[in-house]
């Protein structure tokens, strides 16, 4: 990384991500945390309490809010970049200047160990790593990166500029949109969990003849599994971020710009609206819906649909304020139970005395 403060401003000011710059036009060689910053670094501050630490460590530049920027004075010794949304600004700056270059590989552009079916047209700018297997009639968009041991089965489609990290499997006929990132070991389109039983309760597999559709700009974490539909499609819509170790059952539909944290498990045909946030270990029964802009907290367990946006927690899931009141009582349950038993006994004795 080697970029000046003025270059960052020039790149991001037109879209309003960074609004101003005061101080010197410093050269930045690294984006660093406050506790580890040094000369040449860019740090970000979203709380005034960190200003003193930054001044003491003397990085090249700081990215902060208009209010905090005022604490550095009109002619600061270090460069100050001003952004209305500091967290968003640092994310996009790191993407532009400090992200891993997945196209910079030590292998040939197409590794000789890759197995590619003759029907596949490989774009001139695609990167295909060691041990990759690509089945018949697969469609690859421009600029795709397929790292070591990726498997793409027959008829699947991978959109432009999508990156598949090592060990990703995209199963038959599944579709991945443009600009997606699939992290190591995730499996898209394995058969869903569907069985029929006879009178003796013997199990019979139900073939899943649907597929998975992942729309554009979706990020899927390591070892996440998304099952193909029994019929039709399991769908993850654009802009959604999925953490590691998440499981989506057959025919689940996730709306745009959702966030699913680790260990979330959604049963078949669950429907999430737009911008739903599911924190760690959220779970649902099948065939329920969750309204746009809902937030699911504290191992939320949903056994019924959520029709109104809001914050919900616990299992069975309940409105957050109700959940917090109930949790406050939990440590006193034994005491309350003991007092109730004594009260019942006293009432019974009063009745006998009459």
Swiss-Prot record:
<comment type="subunit">
    <text>Homotrimer.</text>
</comment>
<feature type="active site" description="Proton acceptor">
    <location>
        <position position="250"/>
    </location>
</feature>
<dbReference type="InterPro" id="IPR020573">
    <property type="entry name" value="UDP_GlcNAc_AcTrfase_non-rep"/>
</dbReference>
<dbReference type="InterPro" id="IPR007691">
    <property type="entry name" value="LpxD"/>
</dbReference>
<dbReference type="InterPro" id="IPR018357">
    <property type="entry name" value="Hexapep_transf_CS"/>
</dbReference>
<dbReference type="GO" id="GO:0016410">
    <property type="term" value="F:N-acyltransferase activity"/>
</dbReference>
<dbReference type="Pfam" id="PF04613">
    <property type="entry name" value="LpxD"/>
</dbReference>
<comment type="pathway">
    <text>Bacterial outer membrane biogenesis; LPS lipid A biosynthesis.</text>
</comment>
<protein>
    <recommendedName>
        <fullName>UDP-3-O-acylglucosamine N-acyltransferase</fullName>
        <ecNumber>2.3.1.191</ecNumber>
    </recommendedName>
</protein>
<keyword id="KW-0677">Repeat</keyword>
<comment type="function">
    <text>Catalyzes the N-acylation of UDP-3-O-acylglucosamine using 3-hydroxyacyl-ACP as the acyl donor. Is involved in the biosynthesis of lipid A, a phosphorylated glycolipid that anchors the lipopolysaccharide to the outer membrane of the cell.</text>
</comment>
<comment type="similarity">
    <text>Belongs to the transferase hexapeptide repeat family. LpxD subfamily.</text>
</comment>
<keyword id="KW-0441">Lipid A biosynthesis</keyword>
<dbReference type="GO" id="GO:0016020">
    <property type="term" value="C:membrane"/>
</dbReference>
<keyword id="KW-0444">Lipid biosynthesis</keyword>
<keyword id="KW-0443">Lipid metabolism</keyword>
<dbReference type="Pfam" id="PF14602">
    <property type="entry name" value="Hexapep_2"/>
</dbReference>
<dbReference type="GO" id="GO:0009245">
    <property type="term" value="P:lipid A biosynthetic process"/>
</dbReference>
<dbReference type="Pfam" id="PF00132">
    <property type="entry name" value="Hexapep"/>
</dbReference>
<keyword id="KW-0012">Acyltransferase</keyword>
<dbReference type="InterPro" id="IPR001451">
    <property type="entry name" value="Hexapep"/>
</dbReference>
<dbReference type="InterPro" id="IPR011004">
    <property type="entry name" value="Trimer_LpxA-like_sf"/>
</dbReference>
<keyword id="KW-0808">Transferase</keyword>
């Amino acid at each position: 990384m080697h970029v000046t403060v003025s270059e960052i401003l020039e790149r991001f000011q037109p879209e309003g991500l960074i609004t101003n710059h005061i101080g010197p036009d410093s050269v930045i060689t690294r984006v660093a945390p406050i506790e580890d910053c040094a000369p040449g670094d860019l740090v970000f501050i979203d709380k005034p309490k960190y200003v003193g630490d930054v001044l003491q460590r003397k990085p090249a530049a700081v990215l902060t809010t208009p209010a905090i920027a005022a604490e550095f004075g009109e002619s600061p010794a270090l460069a100050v970049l001003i952004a209305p949304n500091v967290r968003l600004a640092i994310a996009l700056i790191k993407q532009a200047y400090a992200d891993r270059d997945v196209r910079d590989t030590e292998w040939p552009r197409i590794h000789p160990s890759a197995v590619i079916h003759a029907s596949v047209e490989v774009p001139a700018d695609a990167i295909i790593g060691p041990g990759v297997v690509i089945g018949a009639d697969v469609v690859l968009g421009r600029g795709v990166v397929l790292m070591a041991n990726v498997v793409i089965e027959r008829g699947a489609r991978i959109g432009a500029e999508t990156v598949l990290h090592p060990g990703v499997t995209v199963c038959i006929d599944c579709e991945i949109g443009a600009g997606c990132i699939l992290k190591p070991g995730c499996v898209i389109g394995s058969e869903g969990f569907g069985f029929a039983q006879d009178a003796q309760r013997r199990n019979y597999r139900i073939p899943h003849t649907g597929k998975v559709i992942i729309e554009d700009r979706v990020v899927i974490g390591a070892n996440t599994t998304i099952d193909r539909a029994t019929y039709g499609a399991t769908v993850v819509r654009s802009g959604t971020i999925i953490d590691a170790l998440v499981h989506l059952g057959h025919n689940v539909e996730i709306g745009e710009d959702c966030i699913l944290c680790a260990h979330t498990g959604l049963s078949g045909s669950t429907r999430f609206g737009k911008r739903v946030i599911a924190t760690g270990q959220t779970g649902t029964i099948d065939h329920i819906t969750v309204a746009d802009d809902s937030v699911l907290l504290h191992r939320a367990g949903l056994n019924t649909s959520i029709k109104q946006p809001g914050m919900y927690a616990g299992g069975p899931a309940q409105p957050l304020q109700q959940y917090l009141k109930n949790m406050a009582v939990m440590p006193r349950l034994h005491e309350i139970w003991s007092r109730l038993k004594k009260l019942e006994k006293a009432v019974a004795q009063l009745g006998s005395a009459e």
